[in-house]
Amino acid sequence: MPDPSTYRPAPGSIPVEPGVYRFRDPHGRVIYVGKAKSLRSRLTSYFADITGLHPRTRQMVTTAGSVEWTVVGTEVEALQLEYNWIKEFDPRFNVRYRDDKSYPVLAVTLNEEYPRLFVYRGPRRKGVRYFGPYSHAWAIRETLDLLTRVFPARTCSNGVFKRHKQIDRPCLLGYIEKCSAPCIGRVSAQEHREIVLDFCDFLSGKTDRLARDMEREMNQAAQELNFERAARLRDNISALQRALERQTVVFGDGTDADVVAFSDDELEAAVQVFHVRGGRVRGQRGWIVEKTGDPGDSDLQGLVEQFLTQFYGDQADLVYAADTEADVAPVPREVLVPVLPRDAEGMTSWLTGLRGSRVSLRVPQRGDKKALAETVERNAKEALAQHKLKRAGDLTTRSAALQELQDALGLEQAPLRIECIDISHVQGTDVVASLVVFEDGLSRRSDYRHYSIREAAGDGRSDDVASIAEVTRRRFARHVQDQQAVTEYAAEGHSRKFAYPPNLFVVDGGAPQVNAAAAELSELGVTDVAVIGLAKRLEEVWVPGEPDPVILPRTSEALYLLQRVRDEAHRFAITFHRSKRSRRMTASVLDGIPGLGEARRAALVSHFGSVAQLKKASVEEITAVPGIGAATAVAVREALIETDSSAPSSGATEAVLPAMVENGVDDTPST
């Protein structure tokens, strides 16, 4: 029996968006399908306390060997995908959770004179059309409640229908116009059947014709001055449009298409495909592929070309091997990709030959197809992130990565503590740096630090080297200071996070950056820290004083770890840079006034409308603002007068920065 802790995803790695998740057993069989408004909340509930789960749920969690998910745009999409996958996979725990009952479906009795819509369980009957299955009966009732506003078809039982026919009075739904009331002859049997057929067409994805027909009837009613009917049709059209907007997973034109998306880094790529048949998502597949390293094959155009060739070639082999006369085409009518391959015309011709009829290969630009393409892309990004996190989170993998780093760099011991710095700026302005810490191959966010660069400024590119040198000097000067005080603090029970050096110090860059960092360490007398640089373009590892870089194998766990450390430093630096730039751009002359906090500043600006109007106000007028006393009003007035009489300076910007940032380090733990 698998241990749930062996496949439990990290909570932070699970998206908060709505989606559908699948538990698989160790053999890869789907044993449970579920949907969630928030994937993170739902999935973490399965692993929080195994003993507190329902016995059936606990059995499912302990039987499963893996869990995966698909992100969608809305809860409606998640519901729809859940239905399709329950029908496709027939998961054992889903069925048994329903107490061995069949899943409910939406039945339409086309074999009756007055067809009706209702929730149904049981064997299929001739002359009845079914939509579903659904996981819950309430989902069908919600669908009926929404659509009977537009398609007022009968939903009552035969007994209720006969009773109201006898008393010649409609039920409540008839009075509120959610039923066309065929029981009292408000519509004929043929008119009611047409309403039901339109309802079926809508659920089948044939929405364009319905919208056109309603619009034509609305215009005709308006021309006949039947404005009440025209208004009702207008409301029906709006209701249809709202229903379609909530279902961006569905193509309104009922087309067959494959929607393909990629997410890649320097070494690998994730590809996701949503298979749309009849306008609805019928399946989803995903792969992680290793890049070849050839620029022609590793860019997005090359990835698209390789995927189309291999995937549809294999599909054609499967279809024709099973039945040479099969009417199932290996290629759908449309293939939607993020970019066209280099030889788009040749690829289209090849796909057309496989299908036996014209295939449209294109990039979606707008509408529901563009929306679905964005959903598929989100899933590709999630798949790649999960793949990388799984590799990094595995203890064996992390141990192998540290051992590979030790061997490749000739270190005396495995680099159990790795620190990495990265510089972020825009053309030399708002230059900041980040320092991230990894211990045992995992991030230690409580030790992350921000730096505001004080000495380097200028054209940006050339200042990267000076900025690297400054951050290195300040970080290890702090290490020297902490090392001197470590005995004193240890006696008092305090920990000094920088009292010991990292085993490996990584800088983002090549030989110039690495040599600058090594020079600073040498000047400070730090000799027990290995320094390397990781260059982005070719992922080369540079060592100080060496003319050539160290080339790690592209599939090595050591390179994966270095990439992850470097990418985390880059993310952390960009986040701080954006925050600092935003504070500078929104700094105010009121920021540095003693006794004037954020709430009082907002009250002043709200009362006077702008700082310019505030400058014209007297002390008495400022005092009239709620929460502003006489002393504060005088301070505000004096500060505004002083600002007008002096040239603008950067003091306002510096005043809003925390004290530790002015000293070079923000000691607030960051996430």
Curated annotation (Swiss-Prot):
Sequence ranges assigned to domain UVR in this UniProt record: 208-243
Region of interest: Disordered: 645-671
One GO MF term attached to the UniProt entry: DNA binding
Keywords: Cytoplasm, DNA damage, DNA excision, DNA repair, Excision nuclease, SOS response
Keyword Cytoplasm tagged: yes
Quaternary structure and partners: Interacts with UvrB in an incision complex.
Family, per entry: Belongs to the UvrC family.
Function: The UvrABC repair system catalyzes the recognition and processing of DNA lesions. UvrC both incises the 5' and 3' sides of the lesion. The N-terminal half is responsible for the 3' incision and the C-terminal half is responsible for the 5' incision.
Name recorded for this polypeptide: UvrABC system protein C
Organism: Mycobacteroides abscessus (strain ATCC 19977 / DSM 44196 / CCUG 20993 / CIP 104536 / JCM 13569 / NCTC 13031 / TMC 1543 / L948) (Mycobacterium abscessus)
Name of the encoding gene: uvrC
